[in-house]
């Protein structure tokens, strides 16, 4: 086991505080509409230019092991806030720095760290209640566009695209962000459920020009196993022919005699049919077939359920308004599933998303949720250079998460004003002792810092402007850093999602209060590189 280095009490906290400051100072220059960019060196390719707090935080590693511990703890704050709310990472970092700084001073003055932590927790709880009480629900499309525009650092085009995408696919729908091949940013919406499997054979094509299959009002057979012989399906196929409707077969694979028979029937015109392979693999395939069954109001034919193919009747097949299949994708539009069943399935998938610890699983579950709940929108971000496209893509990602958060928990005035207005809520907090009161006062000072930083980044005097704001009692009245005017912030669209402000404060307080209560740091001693011995020298007589 390698030797360790240990630091104690004020020495330990001082080192950690230095690391916290290094990271937070690099991140906080990006805060607000007039925040600056940070340029990050990449190990290959051009440097990356960003105004996204979490991207900056993730790039910072310090030489000194003890300082690095402090920096990594604050980096954790930014990452956690980003995962939960998708934005507010810079605010969270600034809050964490303020709480750690004030807390370290209080501990150095001889206060009990555990009571300070209790005081901080009491204060945070009071502020969160105040934020929740004052949050305004958003409903209109223009409000959604405003939130998106602010999170995208004032880019109205991004705001417009996001509002349009959310209107089309709903709040649960998946919005993916890709890099475009052109200068323009564009939006493409896929309605209904789409999965990445195309037709098994090109002979199924109904539109030869576009090389795709289009069915109106088809039946959908969902089968979990391979189909190689059609003997068991003959009665079902006869019923489908009599109904005069097309049939889409989704199975693990369709091969041999089964495929030949379906193709021949299609070419002779007796049966409008198309077959596609089932999406996904293993357990995920089962779950996705079940999703398709619920969406179309059919039954997934599976031996687990004891249903054999020969016993399948027409009423066990799913129905949809339209199905479009091309070489690579199948889209089912407007399935005939019962709304109640689809909602129950959506709730079940949401519960799984909450429980899962794997990012990959979460992403796949969210895809399934979107396909059931509304559809998929793709925003393709354009730009003149690769660096510009990457930077805009970062901002679209931020804006998308912030907009979702705003729809979820409502909006508050932006510019750090909501936290300033929450100062009043702290007057009602009843701490048990002077040390807890000091903890409440730490939060009282910390929640003024984001507003000050935004104002400072805009080139104004932070303390002066914050003093002016606190003199006036109107909740939405604040300083618009973009224009340099005092106005009703919600009225002019300077807003923050309540979830983002709440998450930033809770995460910052959680990590910062742990740093305050730290009394010892343990790190590995750096290994001394010993130069290898030189090989023995030979004589010169050869």
Curated annotation (Swiss-Prot):
InterPro entries, per the entry: Chaperonin_Cpn60_CS (IPR018370), Cpn60/GroEL (IPR001844), Cpn60/GroEL/TCP-1 (IPR002423), GroEL-like_apical_dom_sf (IPR027409), GROEL-like_equatorial_sf (IPR027413), TCP-1-like_intermed_sf (IPR027410)
Keyword Cytoplasm: yes
Any one biological process term the GO annotation gives: protein refolding
SUPFAM superfamilies assigned: GroEL apical domain-like, GroEL equatorial domain-like, GroEL-intermediate domain like
Flavoprotein as UniProt keyword: no
Catalytically driven reaction(s): ATP + H2O + a folded polypeptide = ADP + phosphate + an unfolded polypeptide
GO cellular-component term (any): cytoplasm
Coiled coil: none
Gene Ontology molecular-function annotations: ATP binding; ATP-dependent protein folding chaperone; isomerase activity; unfolded protein binding
Record keywords, A-Z: ATP-binding, Chaperone, Cytoplasm, Isomerase, Nucleotide-binding
Binding-site residues for ATP, renumbered to this chain: 30-33, 51, 87-91, 415, 480-482, 496
Domain of life: Bacteria
Subcellular locations according to the entry: Cytoplasm
UniProt similarity note: Belongs to the chaperonin (HSP60) family.
Self-association state and partner proteins as the record states: Forms a cylinder of 14 subunits composed of two heptameric rings stacked back-to-back. Interacts with the co-chaperonin GroES.
Annotated function: Together with its co-chaperonin GroES, plays an essential role in assisting protein folding. The GroEL-GroES system forms a nano-cage that allows encapsulation of the non-native substrate proteins and provides a physical environment optimized to promote and accelerate protein folding.
Name assigned to this protein: Chaperonin GroEL 1
Organism whose genome encodes this protein: Nitrobacter winogradskyi (strain ATCC 25391 / DSM 10237 / CIP 104748 / NCIMB 11846 / Nb-255)
């Amino acid at each position: 086991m390698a030797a360790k280095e240990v630091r104690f009490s004020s020495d330990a906290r001082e080192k950690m505080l230095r690391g916290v400051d290094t990271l937070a100072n690099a991140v906080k220059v990006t805060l607000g509409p007039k925040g600056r960019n940070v340029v990050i060196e990449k190990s290959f390719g051009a440097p990356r230019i960003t105004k996204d707090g979490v991207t900056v935080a993730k790039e910072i590693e310090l030489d000194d092991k003890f300082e690095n511990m402090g920096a990594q703890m604050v980096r954790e704050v930014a990452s956690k806030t980003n995962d939960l709310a998708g934005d507010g990472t810079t605010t969270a970092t600034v809050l964490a720095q303020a709480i750690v700084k004030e807390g370290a001073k209080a501990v150095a003055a001889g206060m009990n760290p555990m009571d300070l932590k209790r005081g901080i927790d009491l204060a945070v709880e009071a502020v969160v209640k105040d934020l929740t009480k004052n949050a305004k629900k958003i409903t209109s499309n223009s409000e959604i566009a405003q939130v998106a525009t602010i999170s995208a650092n004032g880019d109205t085009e991004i705001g417009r695209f996001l509002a349009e995408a959310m209107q089309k696919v709903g709040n649960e729908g998946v919005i993916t962000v890709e890099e475009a091949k052109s200068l323009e940013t564009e939006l493409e919406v896929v309605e209904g459920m789409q999965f990445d499997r195309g037709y098994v054979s090109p002979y199924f094509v109904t539109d030869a020009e576009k090389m795709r299959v289009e069915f109106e009002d088809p039946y959908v057979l969902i089968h979990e196993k391979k189909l190689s012989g059609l003997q068991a399906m003959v009665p079902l196929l006869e019923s489908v022919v009599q109904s005069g409707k097309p049939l889409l077969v989704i199975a693990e694979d369709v091969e041999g005699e089964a495929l030949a028979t379906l193709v021949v029937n299609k070419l002779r015109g007796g049966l409008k049919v198309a077959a596609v392979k089932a999406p996904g693999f293993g357990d995920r395939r089962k779950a996705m077939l079940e999703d398709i069954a619920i969406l179309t109001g059919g039954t997934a034919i599976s031996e687990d359920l004891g249903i054999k193919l020969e016993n399948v009747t027409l009423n066990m097949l799913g129905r949809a308004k339209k199905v479009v299949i091309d070489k690579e994708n199948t889209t089912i539009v407007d399935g005939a599933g019962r709304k109640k069943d689809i909602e129950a399935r959506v709730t079940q998938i949401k519960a799984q998303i909450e429980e899962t610890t794997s990012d990959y699983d979460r992403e796949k579950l969210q895809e399934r949720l979107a396909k059931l709940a509304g559809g998929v929108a793709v925003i393709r971000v354009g730009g003149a250079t690769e660096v510009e496209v990457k930077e805009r893509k970062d901002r679209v990602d931020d804006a998308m998460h912030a907009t979702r958060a705003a729809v979820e928990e409502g909006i508050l005035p932006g510019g750090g004003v909501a936290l300033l207005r929450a100062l009043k809520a702290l007057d009602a907090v009843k701490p048990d002792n002077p040390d807890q009161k000091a903890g409440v006062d730490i939060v009282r000072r910390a929640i003024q810092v984001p507003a000050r930083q935004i104002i400072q980044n805009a080139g104004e005097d932070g303390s002066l402007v914050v003093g002016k704001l606190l003199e006036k009692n109107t909740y939405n009245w604040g300083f618009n850093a973009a224009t340099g005017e005092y106005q009703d912030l919600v009225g002019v669209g300077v807003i923050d999602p309540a979830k983002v402000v709440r998450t930033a404060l809770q995460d910052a307080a959680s990590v910062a209060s742990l740093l305050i209560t730290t009394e010892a740091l343990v790190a590995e001693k750096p290994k001394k590189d010993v130069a290898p011995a030189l090989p023995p020298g030979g004589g010169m007589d050869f």
